[in-house]
Amino acid sequence: MTHISTWIDEYHKGSRFGLNGEILIKQNSKYQEIIVIENEYYGRALMLDGCWMTSLKDEKYYHECLVHPALSSIDEKSNVLIIGGGDGGTARECVKYPQISKIDLVEIDEEVIKISKKFLKEIGGEAWSDKRLKIHIDDGVQWVKKTRDNFYDVIFIDCSDPSELSNLLFSDSFYRECKRILTKNGILATQSESPESFKNIHISILKTLKKFFRVSETMYSFVPIYPSGIWSWTFASEEVLHLSKRNCNEALRIEKSCEIWNLNFQNAAFKMMPNKIVKELNS
């Protein structure tokens, strides 16, 4: 059988990042074009509507950084909500915590889940068979609207970059509703874009979260497959966040299972805000 290699590129502001390899699947869902390619270095990689979402090589930079600063620092974590996350990586990191009773994963595009289960099995791993994980094919904005007050202990927003499909996940009204359905000590954890490639969106997210939550903190790290390679995650709450704990038994247990995240990595990442972002936030 002949394997045909081709280049697949993401274009961004006059630059492009491409992977060469065999296209394993290319199809249009109800919402977007979905491609999975097999690359010699990055392994299998997922692209949605021309944007790289994840790859087997570097997905843990993203998923471990989104999940563990929140879950390792909060005592009560019975109910967890994941908005997006159809590749399964965020759920995989969540199921490491036995205290969690239920994980609602709300993904608008069922095809992303189906394709991830088939072609990117390593990312979701055991999460797909964990009985605590409940999958809902639904609009995340509408799901949050119909959820009762003070229900979730942690909300993860694991969505794609702002687009026609996801714009409302970055809106004031959405963050306000997320705050409403969080418990008193709950944490909202969201990917907050790149301070380089998506600077204006990044600053907008940070300012909006500061408007609705008493406390918010942002960490920076690397996701090589994304434009510019630097990414961010922001954590917001009404209570003081304990994201810089150095002696946390929960964190020490979890980091043994991680490739990227540990407490030292996290503590440094929370101190990496570029000065141009600091100036913008203070202006």
From Swiss-Prot:
Pathway: Amine and polyamine biosynthesis; spermidine biosynthesis; spermidine from putrescine: step 1/1
Subcellular location per the Swiss-Prot or TrEMBL entry: Cytoplasm
Stretches assigned to coiled coil: none
Active site (record annotation): 158 (proton acceptor)
Annotated disulfide bonds: none
Transmembrane helix listed as a keyword: no
Subunit: Homodimer or homotetramer.
Protein name in the entry: Polyamine aminopropyltransferase
